[in-house]
Amino acid sequence: MATGPRYTVPMRRRREARTNYHQRLRLLKSGKPRLVARKSNNQTKAQLVVTGPQGDETVASATSADLEAFGWEAPTGNLPAAYLTGLLAGKRAIEAGLDEAVLDIGLNTATPGNKVFAVQEGVIDAGLEVPHNEDVFADWQRTRGAHIAEYAEQLEDGLYSGDFDATELPDHFDEVRERVEDEL
């Protein structure tokens, strides 16, 4: 006679599609701080997290909304903003005393040229040691936003109107990148 169900219910955070526990365990066994990169349509977040007996502790963090303090006027959900967010988080992590990390992309798909890899590239350019494969990074012109500027030039006037002229994105990216590197 049957005594109960033959299945096991996944852990709550796995059911909610928030945590991959197998991946988390592998990252924790490395003993290095984790570079937690998360993306959405509107912004990118980067955190450097150290795991201890009392739980995870965020040592340094940055969001793409923080870029406004450095003069960023373009939208914050694109690839150039993700790179600059990683650069800012990396600079803050170095100030906090970290020198290495391992990338934690969570449940994001590891697609080459993805925003999470742009965050990783920014952190590496800031001076942190992060194990990586150069093949997953986007082309530098794409990271600067040249593809967005080319698309904006193809459109008719008025279709891409807003507060920021997207045709000037690569130059604006270079200006903000210099400010982030100089001020921290």
Swiss-Prot record:
This protein's GO CC annotations: cytosolic large ribosomal subunit
Keyword Membrane: no
Superkingdom, taxonomy of origin: Archaea
Transmembrane regions: none
Keyword Ribonucleoprotein appears in the UniProt entry: yes
Entry keywords, A to Z: Ribonucleoprotein, Ribosomal protein, RNA-binding, rRNA-binding
Record GO terms (molecular function): 5S rRNA binding; structural constituent of ribosome
GO biological process, alphabetically ordered: ribosomal large subunit assembly; translation
InterPro entries: Rbsml_uL18_euk
Family: Belongs to the universal ribosomal protein uL18 family.
Function: This is one of the proteins that bind and probably mediate the attachment of the 5S RNA into the large ribosomal subunit, where it forms part of the central protuberance.
Subunit details: Part of the 50S ribosomal subunit. Contacts the 5S and 23S rRNAs.
Protein name in the entry: Large ribosomal subunit protein uL18
Source organism of this protein record: Natronomonas pharaonis (strain ATCC 35678 / DSM 2160 / CIP 103997 / JCM 8858 / NBRC 14720 / NCIMB 2260 / Gabara) (Halobacterium pharaonis)
Protein's gene: rpl18
